[in-house]
């Protein structure tokens, strides 16, 4: 079985509870002496086996790291791990999932070695927002309900508002709407990408 590690939680001295996103589930497993295994870090893709335990959580066994070359680059790894942490907070408490969550991570991980990490992550996020029906397709400010003009600001969840209402940096409305439609950052300048990343860090 394969999955992405979204969170690890230390218990006792060296044991870990790990949360792993697989094709259709968010699994919670237990690993004895998990802190001794450097592979058990947020964002890692692993192959593993699950061993049932009638008294406690299922155990994580026979771990194999399915690594990527970009994991050696600290900046790419940082952005990736941050996105995985945000995704876990969004999915926490859910057990069964549509495969799009795993597939989006898998696709993004394959792109990360060749593309700008923030562009990859923002496109992943837009893909998931679109799947969840959360990409805004109406042309009004969520704070005052008045029509949006050429410039907009983004709140958590990429909800649109007037810059004067939200008191934050303005972005071009047409570019943001194109990003929502295509889930592609190709038309966005790097400064706009960085602003979207700052908004994403507020949470899913």
Question: Model segments located where?
Answer:
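Non-catalytic alpha-helical scaffolds and adjoining flexible linkers that form interface surfaces
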Residues: 1-14, 21-204
């Amino acid at each position: 079985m394969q999955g992405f590690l979204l969170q690890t939680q230390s218990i006792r001295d060296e044991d870990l509870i790990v949360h792993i996103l697989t094709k259709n589930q968010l699994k919670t497993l237990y690993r004895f002496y998990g802190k001794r295994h450097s592979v058990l870090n947020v964002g890692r893709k692993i192959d593993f086996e699950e061993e049932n335990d009638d008294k406690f959580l299922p155990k994580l066994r026979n771990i194999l790291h399915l690594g990527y070359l970009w994991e050696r680059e600290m900046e790419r790894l940082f952005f990736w791990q941050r996105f995985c942490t945000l995704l876990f907070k969004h999915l926490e408490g859910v057990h069964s999932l549509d495969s799009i969550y795993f597939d989006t991570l898998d696709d993004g991980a394959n792109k990360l070695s060749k593309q700008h990490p923030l562009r990859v992550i923002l496109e992943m996020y837009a893909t998931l927002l679109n799947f969840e029906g959360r990409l805004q397709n109406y042309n009004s400010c969520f704070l005052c309900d008045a029509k949006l003009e050429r410039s907009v600001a983004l709140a958590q969840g990429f909800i649109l508002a007037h810059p004067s209402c939200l008191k934050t940096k303005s972005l071009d409305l047409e570019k943001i709407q194109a990003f929502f439609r295509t889930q592609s950052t190709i038309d966005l300048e790097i400064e706009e990408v960085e602003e979207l990343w700052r908004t994403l860090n507020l949470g899913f």
